[in-house]
Amino acid sequence: MIDPIEQFHLNKIFTIGHIGNQEIAFTTSSAYMLLAVVLIAAMMLGAGRALVPGRFQSVVELAYEFVANTIRTSAGSHGMTFFPLVFSLFMFIFVSNIVGIIPYTFTVSSHIIVTFSLALLVFLTVIIYGFYKNGLKFFKLFVPSGIPAVILPLVVIIEIISFFSRPISHSVRLFANMLAGHVTLKVFASFVTMLGALGFVGKVGALLPLGLTVALTGLELMVAFLQAYVFTILTCIYLNDAIHPGH
C-alpha cells in the first residue's frame, strides 16, 4: 500500500540562506502558501466593483458578508476593527484547504507548525490589544463574575490554564481534521490502485473504494469550509475577550 503519510513530507525547492548552522529553505509548504496568497489576491483584484456583480465579485462579496456577520455575531460591532485580520485568516485557510484536495498537491493546513503559527498570531493579538484597550482591567478575563469566593482561586487557575492553552487547541483542531481527512482519502485511493492492478475481477472490486473515495472527496470539500469557519469563529470569540474582558 502507498504510504498515506508521504503526501505530508516537506521537500526543499531551494535554499534561501542560513542562520548560523540552520538552513532556511523554500519548501513545498512555502510554495503552496504563496500559491494561496496569489489566488486570493487574484480573486480580490479580479472581483471589480460593478453595479451588477459578476462571478468573482459575487464570491468575494459573499465571503465578505459571511465573515462580517460572523464577527458582528461573536464580537459585536467593535469587532469589525479586526475584519482585515479575520477575513485574511478565513480566506487563507479556506483556499489552502481547497487547493490541498486537488490530487498531487500539498495541504498546508495539515502541518501543525502552520496552524500553530496562525493560532499564535491570534493569541498574541488578543493579549496585545487586550492590554492596549483595557490596561490592567484585561485581567478581569480570568475572574468570572458571580463565582463564590470559596472556589474563586480554583476558577482563576482554571481560566488561566484554559487561556494559555488556546493556541494549542485552536491549532490542533484544524491540523488534526485536515491530516485525518487526507490520510483517509489516500488509503481508499491506494485500495483502488491495488485492486485495479489485479485484472478484471480486481477492477470490479475497485468500484467500491472508488465510490467511497469520490464520496470522501465531497465530504472533504465540506470539511475544508467548516474547518476554516471553526477557526474563524473561535478567532472572533477570542478577540471578543480582548474587546470585552469582563463579559
UniProtKB/Swiss-Prot annotation:
GO molecular function: proton-transporting ATP synthase activity, rotational mechanism
Superkingdom of origin: Bacteria
Membrane association type: Multi-pass membrane protein
Keyword Ribonucleoprotein: no
Transmembrane residue ranges: 24-44, 82-102, 112-132, 141-161, 181-201, 206-226
PROSITE patterns according to UniProt: ATPASE_A
One Pfam family matching this protein: ATP-synt_A
Places the protein is found: Cell inner membrane
Disulfide bridge positions per record: none
Main localisation: membrane
Keyword annotations from UniProtKB, A to Z: ATP synthesis, Cell inner membrane, Cell membrane, CF(0), Hydrogen ion transport, Ion transport, Membrane, Transmembrane, Transmembrane helix, Transport
Family to which this protein belongs: Belongs to the ATPase A chain family.
HAMAP family: ATP_synth_a_bact
Assembly and interaction partners: F-type ATPases have 2 components, CF(1) - the catalytic core - and CF(0) - the membrane proton channel. CF(1) has five subunits: alpha(3), beta(3), gamma(1), delta(1), epsilon(1). CF(0) has four main subunits: a, b, b' and c.
Name of the protein described by the UniProt record: ATP synthase subunit a
Organism encoding this protein: Bradyrhizobium sp. (strain ORS 278)
Organism lineage string: Bacteria, Pseudomonadati, Pseudomonadota, Alphaproteobacteria, Hyphomicrobiales
